[in-house]
Amino acid sequence: GIGSTGNQLTVATYNVLNLDPVVENVANVDDMDAGEVDDDAGDGRFAAIANQIVTALATPDIVGLQEVQDNSGAEINDGVVSASDTLGALVQAIVDAGGPTYTAIEVAPAVAETNGGQPGGNIRQAFLYNAARVTLVAGTAGTGNDSTLPQNDAGVVGLSFNPGLIEPGNTAFAGARKPLAAAFDFNGQRIVVVNNHFSSKGGSTPINGAIQPFVNGSEGERRAQTAIVNQFVDDALAIDANANVVVLGDMNEFTFEEPLQILAGADDSSNVLSDLFDVTGLDQLERYTFIFNGNSPAPDPLSVPAAPATPSPAGALSPPHPHSPNRPVPHSPHRPLTSGYELP
């Protein structure tokens, strides 16, 4: 089974759906639209997400979060970009649910309203990590303008900024989320995790709909974005061919479409990444994490094939599907996933 014990490092991905710690003032949200106002704390979303991390995901050593909003939620034009309060509230909720005290890390956007998503929210990726189990490699944290690069750290892969964003100034990420990379040490081994939230599939038409060929919204953007992350992995492997790299997040893509083939390296035959669903042979019926136009893609955590032993997405550990009828207010638009890696 999968658990944060002994030599097994556990890594999870969780889209937390515009999580923020405040009840917005309707006068300060986009178009003064009451639909932009929410109360994630009062509605129990922090507690529910924390409970899933503790019980369903069994307190992973590292949790990659997507759609973390800033401290003022959807309020606009207030100069707020940090998500320290949002992450702090989630860390406390996990403690209240019986979990460990995680350390949260993020790189806030350099300029407000440049990451897309709900106006004012400035969504970004972040990591939670259990410092009792893993160590964030010492270094300089990047800013929203800094681009982190793999570098040689005594024979293993380090990062020029840790944590850091990957090419935040590249036009491929204009109006979209920038990949967040972080390097950790576990049991004397280095692991680099890349947390993504690629451009949405907005504007898509159903695969089997009346419009053929179907429209895959923003596919061109995702092709460019995945190529950049693929190059980052290539650069890491050029430093250490046996590097432990995990690429996870909300890919907003079907596994059979070109952007994820580019990400994995299938288009250039480098094949640097493998889909964990394929590596572990998880049943096809369990490979759903999201319902889009009647189809069930996955956020697709990926691993470098050289990563040791048997990484395995936790089908049995995953919480109930967020769109099940007994959950009228989804805590996440995606099914969270966790994976285990034997690192002796």
Where are these regions (language model features)?
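Divalent cation-coordinating acidic motifs and surrounding scaffolds
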Residues: G1-P344
